[in-house]
């Protein structure tokens, strides 16, 4: 990894200088937060200067799942809105992006931080502003993503649960119900996990990690955010009111069926990391197991079919 970082910094020498200092900034943790496992981050300082830059190296294990150029363009657009650190330059050969580093006083958000109504409302307002802008230029569907990941894990020696095919079998009726109901496609950050939000002074928020940025159904992102922050549907419903200005069962049902699909997607993506990564213990399997469990519980709810009909 040090060699990759040094090669990337050499490519960025016009910005960081000939002899920059760098240090690992973010340690990867797959479970329970899935934080910094698909990239490595370094604080970078010019010679005899303070750390002003952040170097992000995309993980080789997911290179075929991420469009780095789309991510860089999305990050640039979000920065212009005031929603993210500035991406300065991207190098395709190194799969490296250099950002302006957030100053001291910023930290990675936790779920408890974002459960607070004011912060949740601010995140939704940021997402709506992004959605009102021009398209990212890369259309994505969680169902297409599941198909892609399933082909990878089924071809490998992945540790799939016994009911994995049952969970997969639900994706077709969910997809068909969403398509039959019709949906809009809007630009989005696409991955509202707490670890992709930074908290700063004066309640400031910034979005990071743009690998999932795409043109998507906004209710997918909202459903993911609900599922990330809250355990009970009674807690989730106010987020829909913040987003739409009013609550409707139809929109809420769409969010919830998307949440089930998202859990399956990230369970499978974790298994892809388990298959492709050097031995790292059981963290990826633990995270996959948690996402499979949550998907299983949602699909198994007595009223889940009624949610599909409500679309």
Q: What are the functions of these language-model segments?
A:
Residues 95-99, 192, 229:
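Short glycine- and hydrophobic/aromatic-rich loop-to-beta-strand nucleating segment
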Residues 31-55, 172-220:
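Active-site acidic catalytic loop and adjacent metal/ATP-binding pocket
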Residues 32-33, 37-141, 164-165:
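ATP-binding pocket architecture of kinase catalytic cores
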Residues 59-60, 98-114, 132-135, 148-158, ...:
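A glycine-centered beta->alpha junction motif in the catalytic cores
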Residues 219-250, 260-279, 293-294:
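Active-site activation/catalytic loop segments of kinase-like enzymes and analogous catalytic loops
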Residues 269-311:
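ATP/Mg2+ or Mg2+-diphosphate-binding catalytic cores
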Residues 4-23, 132-190, 200-202, 247, ...:
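An alpha-helical support segment within catalytic cores of ATP-dependent transferases
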Residues 119, 162-174, 280-295:
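Extended, well-ordered alpha-helical scaffold segments
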């Amino acid at each position: 990894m040090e060699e990759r970082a040094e090669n990337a910094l050499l490519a960025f020498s016009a910005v960081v200088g000939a002899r920059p200092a760098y240090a690992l900034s973010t340690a990867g943790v797959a479970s329970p937060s899935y934080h910094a496992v698909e990239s490595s981050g370094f604080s970078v300082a010019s010679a005899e200067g303070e750390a002003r830059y952040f170097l992000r190296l995309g993980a080789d294990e997911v290179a075929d799942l991420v469009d780095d150029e789309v991510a860089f363009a999305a990050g640039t657009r979000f920065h212009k809105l005031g929603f993210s650190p500035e991406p300065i330059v991207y190098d395709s050969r190194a799969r490296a992006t250099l950002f302006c580093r957030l100053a001291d006083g910023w930290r990675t958000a936790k779920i408890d931080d974002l459960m607070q109504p004011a912060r949740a409302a601010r995140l939704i307002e940021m997402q709506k502003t992004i959605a009102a802008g021009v398209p990212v230029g890369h259309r994505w569907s969680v169902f297409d993503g599941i198909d892609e990941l399933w082909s990878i894990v089924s071809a490998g020696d992945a540790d799939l649960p016994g009911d994995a095919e049952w969970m997969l079998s639900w994706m077709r009726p969910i997809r068909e119900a969403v398509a039959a109901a019709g949906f809009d496609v809007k630009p989005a950050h696409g991955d509202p996990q707490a670890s992709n939000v930074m908290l700063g002074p004066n309640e400031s928020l910034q979005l990071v990690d743009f690998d999932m940025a795409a043109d998507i159904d906004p209710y997918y992102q909202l459903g993911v955010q609900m599922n990330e922050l809250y355990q009970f549907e009674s807690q989730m419903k106010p987020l829909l009111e913040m987003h739409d200005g009013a609550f409707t069962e139809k929109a809420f049902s769409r969010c919830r069926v998307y949440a089930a699909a998202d859990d399956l997607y990230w369970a499978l993506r974790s298994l892809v990391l388990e298959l492709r990564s050097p031995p790292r213990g059981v963290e990826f399997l633990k995270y996959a197991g948690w996402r499979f469990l949550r998907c299983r519980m949602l699909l198994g709810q007595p009223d889940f079919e009624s949610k599909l009909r409500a679309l």
